[in-house]
Amino acid sequence: MKNIHFDINKYEAHVDLEYLKENGRVEKISDGVIFSSGLENAALHQAVTIDGRHRGVILELNEEFVGIGLIDKTNDILEGMSVSVTDHFIEVNLFEDMAGRIIDTTGKMLYDVSDEQPTASSPLFCVTPAIMTIDSVTRPLNTGLAVIDSITPIGRGQRQLILGNRQSGKTQIAVDTIINQHNQNVHCIYVAIGLKAAYIAEVIETLRKHGAMDYSTVVATAASDSLTAQYLTPYAGMAVAEALRDQGKDVLIIFDDLTKHADAYRAITLLFNRPPGREAYPGDSFYIHSSLLERAVQMNQDHGGGSITAIPMIETLSDDVTAYIPTNVISITDGQLFLKSDLFNRGQKPAVDVGVSVSRIGGDAQHPIIRKLSKNLTLILSQYEELKELLDFGNALDDGSMKMVTDGRMLTELFKQNILSPLSVTELITILYAFQNGFLTKMAPANVQSFKGLLLEKAHAHQKFEEFSNQIEEISELNESHVKMLEEIIQEAGRPFS
């Protein structure tokens, strides 16, 4: 065989290994995610730039490639383009005053053409506060909704889930809660995840119309935005909340909703060829929500005393709370409000199913007077639901059972509440006092709503009610003068219905 001299030197090409540690190239593009070679020093959640102008974040690391999610939706990225890691992890820009801001995942202002520059930034992903820095939940966060504040109260620093079918009133509860924080020294953050742009604009307009944007921030991504932006949005909202919490402020953050967040994450992981699990969600679906919601805490005084109260929302299908994502978030949070479509369609708004709803720690933060007036309300409603089924079949009930039915029917009517009409603490006390002391016993259920409206009108007209409202935070029980005032108001309001 003829000898062949093979000179490998002529094929030698210089490879800059140092360059490949911080740089790479686009090898593949797939529906908003890219696969890059190189980037040996890359870290999870590190910010990158593609071709020096497109923003991305590292979401996947393996031996073959680095998976990058594109923050901006674009068709301008091509295979072979350069990819470079930055010197920071993904973060959201902050402004000196966050009230009234509408921002995207990275803190870029939306619907605002001003050239104001950010003054700081906050990382989207960080560790949960150490347990020694956390305090107990002892202060109430009033929603202004009678059924919630009395039966399933929420405390500052709590995580309370709202779940229910589409069009069952989840967002309306959140909006009412934000509006009720007026003059309560609570900064509100509404996080819209993958919603229609028109729907987001409608919520913002409602908040602005009621003056709530004066103490609120909106972090939003629309359904038309990239999957990565939708996935990162709740973390951006939490990063803003943490920056405010570190200033000693109380923050309320609404996630609308985490079902769409889980869907966006599922799509991203499937694009990265991760093995699907239950309902095709990846195995770390629990982690993405627990790592987010566990950042909502009440800090102790040594660490500023600020708090983050988180109200995530989950959309159910056919009132099924046993699906994968609902059960995950139920186990992460400190309680849940289950909104039932059947109640909503019957006109019971807010449509809270008291039998399934619970607040595990909110009772410790409830106002002591409301706690005392609310102690047996859950039992009354539960008995009413049981006995009502017997009445539907025409069964005769004894006097004791009929009283339970009457009380339950009255309480159900009292808990009906028009949208955008939150109740103050003293208004709720007045309503509950009227119920608990038998002033509604002989009233027709059809008159309860009219009576409630007149009751609140008479309360605000009473000369001592304003003083009672101003002192309510310092009052732990009703004295004789308070009782006399409440009974005068209730008797005057009840005269037209006697």
UniProtKB/Swiss-Prot annotation:
PANTHER family per the UniProt record, alphabetical: ATP SYNTHASE SUBUNIT ALPHA, MITOCHONDRIAL
Where's it found, cell-wise?
Cell membrane
Where does the source fall among the domains of life?
Answer: Bacteria
- Primary place of residence? membrane
Name of the protein in question: ATP synthase subunit alpha 1
The EC code for this enzyme is 7.1.2.2
Looking at the UniProt record, the site noted as Required for activity sits at 357
Taxonomy of the source species: Bacteria, Bacillati, Bacillota, Bacilli, Bacillales
GO MF entry, a single one: proton-transporting ATP synthase activity, rotational mechanism
Q: Which reaction does it catalyse?
A: ATP + H2O + 4 H(+)(in) = ADP + phosphate + 5 H(+)(out)
Query: InterPro entries of this UniProt entry?
Result: ATP_synth_asu-like_sf, ATP_synth_asu_C, ATP_synth_asu_C_sf, ATP_synth_F1_a_nt-bd_dom, ATP_synth_F1_asu, ATPase_a/bsu_AS, ATPase_F1/V1/A1_a/bsu_N_sf, ATPase_F1/V1/A1_a/bsu_nucl-bd
Q: Which organism is it from?
A: Listeria innocua serovar 6a (strain ATCC BAA-680 / CLIP 11262)
Q: How does it sit in the membrane?
A: Peripheral membrane protein
Family designation: Belongs to the ATPase alpha/beta chains family.
Report keywords, A-Z: ATP synthesis, ATP-binding, Cell membrane, CF(1), Hydrogen ion transport, Ion transport, Membrane, Nucleotide-binding, Translocase, Transport
Subunit info here reads: F-type ATPases have 2 components, CF(1) - the catalytic core - and CF(0) - the membrane proton channel. CF(1) has five subunits: alpha(3), beta(3), gamma(1), delta(1), epsilon(1). CF(0) has three main subunits: a(1), b(2) and c(9-12). The alpha and beta chains form an alternating ring which encloses part of the gamma chain. CF(1) is attached to CF(0) by a central stalk formed by the gamma and epsilon chains, while a peripheral stalk is formed by the delta and b chains.
Kindly give the PROSITE patterns that the UniProt entry links to this protein.
ATPASE_ALPHA_BETA
Functional summary from the UniProt entry: Produces ATP from ADP in the presence of a proton gradient across the membrane. The alpha chain is a regulatory subunit.
- One GO cellular component term: proton-transporting ATP synthase complex
